[in-house]
Amino acid sequence: MASKYAVKLQTDFDNPKWIKRHKFMFDYLDINGNGQITLDEIVSKASDDICKNLGATPAQTQRHQDCVEAFFRGCGLEYGKETKFPEFLEGWKNLANADLAKWARNEPTLIREWGDAVFDIFDKDGSGTITLDEWKAYGRISGISPSEEDCEKTFQHCDLDNSGELDVDEMTRQHLGFWYTLDPEADGLYGNGVP
């Protein structure tokens, strides 16, 4: 699955900004606030909260859940296994290295497969792209971009071809850069919502 968009492939795992970004995500995923996360918590949020509230079909929800499970297992998470932040961070490093190696070889990445699944849910009109309104619905429901301003900033950041709509390739490129490598082209991806 080749991409027309280049991404910075060098990681910067010791950068305090990268660590802070992942600490934000860890805290966001720690639903019960006990300082540990499990795959159970993540799947519950993804399937029971987000997919349900976006009106996903059972098939879409299952596909999305399969991708969420694969992605976070790539970070070392499992059902029933409590993971603290240092272990979570190490897992992200492993996931980032594995996905970036796949990206460099034009192979499907876990983040792209998850993107394909979530796009199928967002894309209500079946156009193959999502609109700003479709993105705003996700941002509001997921809580990752809770304000209209943050949603608009994310959308603008990801609209690499300036078409006024987003395709999964644009979103994947920006998320790889944001979560994996601190690519300056992806900085500010979630507006003020995520460091």
Swiss-Prot record:
Q: Which residues form the EF-hand domain?
A: 17-52, 53-88, 110-145, 146-181
Q: Which domain of life is it from?
A: Eukaryota
**Keywords attached to this entry:** Calcium, Luminescence, Metal-binding, Photoprotein, Repeat
The record's listing under InterPro entries reads: Centrin_CML-like, EF-hand-dom_pair, EF_Hand_1_Ca_BS, EF_hand_dom
Give binding positions for Ca(2+) 3: D159, D161, S163, E165, E170
Q: Which residues form the propeptide?
A: 1-6
* Residues involved in Ca(2+) 2 binding: D123, D125, S127, T129, E134
Sequence positions that bind Ca(2+) 1: D30, N32, N34, Q36, E41
- Please give the family membership noted in the entry: Belongs to the aequorin family.
What is this protein's record name? Obelin
